[in-house]
């Protein structure tokens, strides 16, 4: 069992139960999945660069990324139908908890001038953030990075409100900006 999963079952569930006064234990929010995605439209023209970014995402996440492809051709963007324009990985189970643990304890402190993430969710119990650079992950070999590439990370929970979601993620170790 992962360290974060053990922390969730032993402490975080009790904290959430006390704070939000759930009637049933099944109402307590759970982290369902983490989705990591990269938009690689510029890299789509250069196959070597596209492949390098796919390998970086695989190293960061621990599993092979799914290539997202263009649905339609758009001549103005020099885009062809079926051309790879991005990549995404969906983490569940032990890999999800391991990634969350690494992200909170190793990656977040490496962000320059980090004072916490924004406190704005989507209103439905999910939280998303964007990173400007993949080089903050210690798994990425800095000598092999050809171009800086950002990514989006989305935490999907069973929470009904933003407050529940943010409390769950904060208890798991994600740092948010203090509201003024």
From Swiss-Prot:
Query: What Pfam families does its record include?
Result: Ribosomal_L5, Ribosomal_L5_C
Output the Gene Ontology cellular-component terms: ribonucleoprotein complex; ribosome
Under the heading InterPro entries, the entry gives: Ribosomal_uL5, Ribosomal_uL5_bac-type, Ribosomal_uL5_C, Ribosomal_uL5_CS, Ribosomal_uL5_dom_sf, Ribosomal_uL5_N
Keyword rRNA-binding in annotation:
yes
The record's keywords, sorted A to Z, are:
Ribonucleoprotein, Ribosomal protein, RNA-binding, rRNA-binding, tRNA-binding
Query: Per its UniProt record, what Gene3D superfamilies does this chain match?
Result: 3.30.1440.10
TM region positions:
none
Molecular function terms in GO for this entry? rRNA binding; structural constituent of ribosome; tRNA binding
The record's listing under SUPFAM superfamilies reads: RL5-like
- Give the GO biological process terms: translation
Q: What does the protein in this record do?
A: This is one of the proteins that bind and probably mediate the attachment of the 5S RNA into the large ribosomal subunit, where it forms part of the central protuberance. In the 70S ribosome it contacts protein S13 of the 30S subunit (bridge B1b), connecting the 2 subunits; this bridge is implicated in subunit movement. Contacts the P site tRNA; the 5S rRNA and some of its associated proteins might help stabilize positioning of ribosome-bound tRNAs.
Quaternary structure, per UniProt, is: Part of the 50S ribosomal subunit; part of the 5S rRNA/L5/L18/L25 subcomplex. Contacts the 5S rRNA and the P site tRNA. Forms a bridge to the 30S subunit in the 70S ribosome.
Q: Which family does it belong to?
A: Belongs to the universal ribosomal protein uL5 family.
> What is the name of the protein in this document?
Large ribosomal subunit protein uL5
Top-level taxonomy:
Bacteria, Pseudomonadati, Chlamydiota, Chlamydiia, Chlamydiales
Gene, per the UniProt record: rplE
